């Protein structure tokens, strides 16, 4: 069975694992999911990630971060979706919770946080936001 929105599936798995207080979560891997996990790690929302399993069907294992028993990710939500893509120019990139959160942007130079995209002067598709 094909999946219509693998990014939403990834975000839901991370959200559910946090609610269940799991140490890590596994999901099917892809280049875009690895890039999103890299941004989450750079911004301090997850401990790390690694690819495990066979070469034909790799699995992405994300190690979640907790601070004093509370999840590092309070909210994680899909912004642009397959039925309604959302693109923003460099001057229109969203600020999540007045700069306390992070938007993850897919640009022509790769996947990056909203702060990096603003600093480099890039716009792109707003994939999701994290707080």
UniProtKB/Swiss-Prot annotation:
Descriptive protein name: Small ribosomal subunit protein uS8
Calcium among keywords: no
Keyword Ribonucleoprotein (UniProt): yes
Family as reported in the entry's similarity comment: Belongs to the universal ribosomal protein uS8 family.
Gene3D superfamilies according to UniProt: 3.30.1370.30, 3.30.1490.10
HAMAP family from the UniProt entry: Ribosomal_uS8_B
Gene Ontology annotations for the cellular component aspect, listed alphabetically: ribonucleoprotein complex; ribosome
Subunit field text: Part of the 30S ribosomal subunit. Contacts proteins S5 and S12.
GO biological process, one term: translation
Annotated signal sequence range: none
Native organism taxonomy: Bacteria, Pseudomonadati, Pseudomonadota, Gammaproteobacteria, Chromatiales
GO MF annotation list: rRNA binding; structural constituent of ribosome
InterPro entries xrefs: Ribosomal_uS8, Ribosomal_uS8_CS, Ribosomal_uS8_sf
Its biological purpose: One of the primary rRNA binding proteins, it binds directly to 16S rRNA central domain where it helps coordinate assembly of the platform of the 30S subunit.
Keywords: Ribonucleoprotein, Ribosomal protein, RNA-binding, rRNA-binding
């Amino acid at each position: 069975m094909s999946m219509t929105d693998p990014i939403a599936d990834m975000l839901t798995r991370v959200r559910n694992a946090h609610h269940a207080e799991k140490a890590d979560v596994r999901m099917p891997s892809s280049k875009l999911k690895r890039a999103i996990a890299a941004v989450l790690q750079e911004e301090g929302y997850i401990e790390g990630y690694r690819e495990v399993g066979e070469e034909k069907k790799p699995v992405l294992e994300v190690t979640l971060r907790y601070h004093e028993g509370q999840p590092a990710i309070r909210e994680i939500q899909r912004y642009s979706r397959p039925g309604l893509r959302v693109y923003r120019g460099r001057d229109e990139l969203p600020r999540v919770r007045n700069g306390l959160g992070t938007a993850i942007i897919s640009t022509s130079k790769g996947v990056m946080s909203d702060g990096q995209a603003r600093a480099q002067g890039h716009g792109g598709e707003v994939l999701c936001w994290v707080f």
